[in-house]
Swiss-Prot record:
This is CTP synthase. Residues 1-267 are annotated as: Amidoligase domain. The gene is pyrG. Catalyzes the ATP-dependent amination of UTP to CTP with either L-glutamine or ammonia as the source of nitrogen. Regulates intracellular CTP levels through interactions with the four ribonucleotide triphosphates. It comes from the Bacteria. CTPSs have evolved a hybrid strategy for distinguishing between UTP and CTP. The overlapping regions of the product feedback inhibitory and substrate sites recognize a common feature in both compounds, the triphosphate moiety. To differentiate isosteric substrate and product pyrimidine rings, an additional pocket far from the expected kinase/ligase catalytic site, specifically recognizes the cytosine and ribose portions of the product inhibitor. It comes from Bacillus cereus (strain 03BB102). It is an enzyme of class 6 (ligase). Its EC number is 6.3.4.2. Belongs to the CTP synthase family.
Amino acid sequence: MTKYIFVTGGVVSSLGKGITAASLGRLLKNRGLNVTIQKFDPYINVDPGTMSPYQHGEVFVTDDGAETDLDLGHYERFIDINLNKYSNVTTGKIYSSVLQKERRGEYLGGTVQVIPHITNEIKERVYRSGRETNADVVITEIGGTVGDIESLPFLEAIRQIKSDIGRDNVMYIHCTLIPYLKAAGEMKTKPTQHSVKELRSLGIQPNIIVVRTEMPVSQDMKDKLALFCDIDTKAVIEARDADTLYAVPLSLQEQNMDQIVCDHLKLDNPAADMTEWTALVEKVRNLSKKTKIALVGKYVELQDAYISVVEALRHAGYSFDTDVEVKWVNAEHVTAENVQELVGDTDGILVPGGFGDRGVEGKIVAIQYARENKVPFLGICLGMQLASIEFARNVLGLEGANSSEINPDTPYAIIDLLPEQKDVEDLGGTLRLGLYPCKLSEETNAYNAYNEPVVYERHRHRYEFNNQFRPDMEKEGFVFSGTSPDGRLVEIIELKDHPWFVAAQFHPELVSRPNRPQPLFHDFVKASITNKESK
């Protein structure tokens, strides 16, 4: 029978519930269990697809095209599984589904209420995740903080699941904070006690408490927490700030967290073999070289907006024993006059995805700098579109060339809507989303990176390269090295007379893993290191 683990958070948000859930998932997977994981977000948006990155951070896209929470990126990178649309559920999705059922008459004229209709829908999403993946263990992270009004239906639903399927099949893990008061020179357990009290008042008794802390937690403090929160002392797990995220699973294993979980859920599996993971962490902690990459974006104040890009750069660096330092460059501040000052000290330039016109001209200036100065360049999504526009303007001499997204009246729409997108008015869920094939041309940087004729990558965009400009750009050394299998859609572009200048319409960062870097990132970082060494 499938087992269910629920991870909740208390005291404050951003405690690392997602990393805790992902780390536990890795440990259980390494015990030979089939693990899946999901995130429940209490906000009323149907998905984060139309939310500002300043509000939410990155939108992570799954193979099947779901626009999801950035925590799913952590889950995929840690557990090394590909998640699906069932892995991220929002209040908006739940209510939308219930209201559609009500309109279809599925409730037989009954009064539709939070209990049982909303809670039943939530429970069904939990069970469905296990069914669809045939999982031994389903880990579900409940977003938000215990005490938030938005989380109440989710907490009630997970309380009911224990009654439905029995205590041996359900486990509750509560993540809290033990703050350190500098003036008093001591740590305080009271916020954790109150958070657990709040959770218990809702009918949920946590089986494990994971305490986030800056300082070591003494045995006396663990005993105190165990007493007040009614759990075993060994089930108080310390989650101290780590020098690398990938060290967290090892820290949890040292404290026997996965064994406590298996004992409670009556899972008789051998201990997790973390030899490879330990070697990875040792490598990460002892990188001997450095390279600096300029990330030219418009959301640089909130680095979570580019979290998968940064992780993919790091993963690529690990292959070369290199610590990749990201220099954050606000695209709105980049001009032809200061671009040398802003990116001149870096070994490679990356322009990530984005929407809208803010910061576009600064990105184009940075791309021109990379092209003219032979600096390794990687463009992603909008970065690929702007690389095409920069080339059209400055090499073909097409003054005013642009994307019809940015300037609908441009005389040269290098980037334009697909014909089937022209009449679409809704913004949510109407992009080209998810995994699509890309056919590569031999003897190109893209082919050399992948070493395969056809690759599959995840997309999130609406606008495409306008094929009427292809012949003229090819004549000038612009290479279309990756296309859709029918050749209609441009997927990857690069430059002939440049050490390494590649840009992709898809989002390669989404499939990178710490032990298996994404090929374009791998070769981009390699080219950046070569550039540094040649200076």
